């Protein structure tokens, strides 16, 4: 009998835990790293994550520890599932503990503030490993649905197709269907920008602007993503796939989406601080909208929806005023 694949998941939020379940259901031995002892104890003693996936029974071949060295030991895959703006600091602490040939897997959908780096670039910069040992899992993957073992598809992206195929095999279950892709740039941009567009659609929903507005924001948001991706060397087909349109539609349509919910609260008139106070988990788009806009400006790409979201979230611009400015921009051909 072959030895089971070993996976370490650093982060016990809803998505890290849900993906750990996927790996376990696919036959891997999974260890979750938890920052808090009480959460690790709950996972091990009750087979649940009461903080982030209450009521979901976790597989027997998934356990938790607060010791990062124990989690990382001999792991074939080291999955990173922490808030994107904390990745650099956390990973710097974990790098000395990592197994020599482990594949680093990013579940994060963001762009780092200041550097405007994608998450795989941060991993490469901090861990000093080549792109052939860094993979990304992305797509329309709402954690609560996956934890309920509802059908979902995803993209496993890596510059090395063989590594992508290894990870694909390690997380393929009857309910979770991963596809491989070597376009890491496009896959990561799709995930990062959709969080920003999810905020925009949520704001529109909170304002009661209707489905025409939602459809327009989704479509033009996809156009913004594609423009940025093309300038950065991404494959345009990526944006019509799971990492682009698929993820965007799920985020902009579901009440389970943290970014959509965050935007909805802003659109209903809550202040930024009030919205943060009622948001239990990280809505990545709140911080990443600034870094996505920074990235776009570095590449000379016009992203008006992203700019509008930054104005509302970080500059205190009233949504009604921001909407008026967005709608009164000069007319242009659609395919620009």
Swiss-Prot record:
Annotated localization: Cytoplasm
A GO CC term attached to the entry: cytosol
Pathway stated in the Swiss-Prot or TrEMBL entry: Membrane lipid metabolism; glycerophospholipid metabolism
Main location (coarse class): cytoplasm
EC number: 1.1.1.94
Keyword tags: Cytoplasm, Lipid biosynthesis, Lipid metabolism, NAD, NADP, Nucleotide-binding, Oxidoreductase, Phospholipid biosynthesis, Phospholipid metabolism
Annotated residues for binding of sn-glycerol 3-phosphate: 109, 139, 194, 247, 257-259
Cystine pairings recorded for this chain: none
Catalytic reaction annotation: sn-glycerol 3-phosphate + NAD(+) = dihydroxyacetone phosphate + NADH + H(+); sn-glycerol 3-phosphate + NADP(+) = dihydroxyacetone phosphate + NADPH + H(+)
GO biological process: carbohydrate metabolic process; glycerol-3-phosphate biosynthetic process; glycerol-3-phosphate catabolic process; glycerophospholipid metabolic process; phospholipid biosynthetic process
Transmembrane segments: none
SUPFAM superfamilies: 6-phosphogluconate dehydrogenase C-terminal domain-like, NAD(P)-binding Rossmann-fold domains
Top-level enzyme category: oxidoreductase
Residues annotated as binding NADPH: 14-15, 35-36, 109, 143, 258, 284
GO molecular function, one term: NAD binding
Record flagged with keyword Lipid metabolism: yes
PANTHER family associated with the record: GLYCEROL-3-PHOSPHATE DEHYDROGENASE, GLYCEROL-3-PHOSPHATE DEHYDROGENASE [NAD(+)] 2, CHLOROPLASTIC
Function: Catalyzes the reduction of the glycolytic intermediate dihydroxyacetone phosphate (DHAP) to sn-glycerol 3-phosphate (G3P), the key precursor for phospholipid synthesis.
Annotated protein name in UniProt: Glycerol-3-phosphate dehydrogenase [NAD(P)+]
